[in-house]
Amino acid sequence: EQQRYLNAKKYVKLVLVADYIMYLKYGRSLTTLRTRMYDIVNIINLIFQRMNIHVALVGLEIWSNRDKIIVQSSADVTLDLFAKWRETDLLKRKSHDNAQLLTGINFNGPTAGLAYLSGICKPMYSAGIVQDHNKVHHLVAIAMAHEMGHNLGMDHDKDTCTCGARSCVMAGTLSCEPSYLFSDCSRRGHRAFLIKDMPQCILEKPLRTDVVSPPVCGNYFVEVGEECDCGSPATCRDTCCDAATCKLRQGAQCAEGLCCDQCRFKGAGTECRAAKDECDMADLCTGRSAECTDRFQRNGQPCQNNNGYCYNGTCPIMRDQCIALFGPNAAVSQDACFQFNLQGNHYGYCRKEQNTKIACEPQDVKCGRLYCFPSSPATKNPCNIHYSPNDEDKGMVLPGTKCADGKACSNGRCVDVT
């Protein structure tokens, strides 16, 4: 499974935000600024393609009236404010994997940008900020690719790191001879991060209707108006696709997809994806499409020897969640521990409404904070929780988890399984 994950194409669904100073800097022209932002993302996509990562612009926001955070010269303060705004505002409006702020402000010192290491897919940490430090857009694009590299688990290159050029993307300082290449160290760091964290959001391919940048034939994304996109005519190896037009060649039904074989749809009933577990189903081709639609067992079907119920293709049970948080010997705490969820304090609650924490009703206590017993010799406390103010949702009982016979958690309530 690990190898399958590593080999899979990755997609970063990006929202790019420009602050008010950027709007003023480009003459209050939304068209001029948008064009610059599109050009930057096209370069970033080109840079990451060598890593089997495609960057799709799914949102573009220009703060043309006023800034939505206080953008200041202290890069770490601005990053913290931008990341909090992304989590509490942007994510609620627009589904995406990563957000970058392009600012016209001068950061203190030699800093051209800042981002959280290994933050991708995390609500609070999948963010970066970049100064529009050069008129040449591809130099700004390299700086933004550098910050996204941090989000994807890459650290700064050391002197021993090589990429075959004078300077690599993850060099610690800006170079007058930058390249689009990642070093051997960056590749190792990224791979180690993928193995450790296995971020799931970057496996989801964006729909062509999600991409907001103008279609570019040759960027490996099938966008509105295109039937296929296999890269430039020089690099395309796809016999089904005409790289010059991004249209299917004569007689071809498809160019890619699990139900596409040698430019033709696979026959109806052909298995295209095996069932992963008891809550999944084997997926079959329809004979009319190249897509392999992911199907799973109905929600509420008993699983794991009746210890749980299927929920969106998974079988969430509390013990597995405790193991994920506290290690292989962890167990679910006794029922008395869950009474702390009646308090409605900063960690013991069932749900949040307008950022206010709502205490659990007595029948819902198993749908709030998860209480675990780590089972290590040093542990005396029978009621352990995972709580981080930066990611308050982590450590809550997952939706769909069995909370009583015939009942599962939904929005912090223990409701009948239907």
Swiss-Prot record:
Binding site for Zn(2+): 146, 150, 156
SUPFAM superfamilies: Blood coagulation inhibitor (disintegrin) (SSF57552), Metalloproteases ('zincins'), catalytic domain (SSF55486)
Main location class: secreted
Residue intervals of the Disintegrin domain: 214-299
Binding site for Ca(2+) 1: 216, 219, 221, 223, 226, 229
EC number: 3.4.24.-
Disulfide bonds: 121-201, 161-185, 163-168, 217-246, 228-241, 230-236, 240-263, 254-260, 259-285, 272-292, 279-310, 303-315, 322-372, 337-383, 350-360, 367-409, 403-414
GO molecular-function term, one example from the UniProt record: toxin activity
Tissue expr: Expressed by the venom gland.
Biological process (GO), any one: proteolysis
SMART domains listed in its UniProt record: ACR (SM00608), DISIN (SM00050)
Motif (D/ECD-tripeptide) on chain: 278-280
GO CC terms: extracellular region; plasma membrane
InterPro entries recorded: ADAM_Cys-rich, Disintegrin_CS, Disintegrin_dom, Disintegrin_dom_sf, MetalloPept_cat_dom_sf, Peptidase_M12B, Reprolysin_adamalysin
Chain positions carrying an annotated carbohydrate: 312
Quaternary data: Homodimer; disulfide-linked.
Function: Snake venom zinc metalloprotease that induces apoptosis in vascular endothelial cells (VEC), without degrading the extracellular matrix (it cannot cleave collagen) or inhibiting adhesion of VEC. Has also fibrinogenolytic and hemorrhagic activities.
Entry protein name: Zinc metalloproteinase-disintegrin-like batroxstatin-2
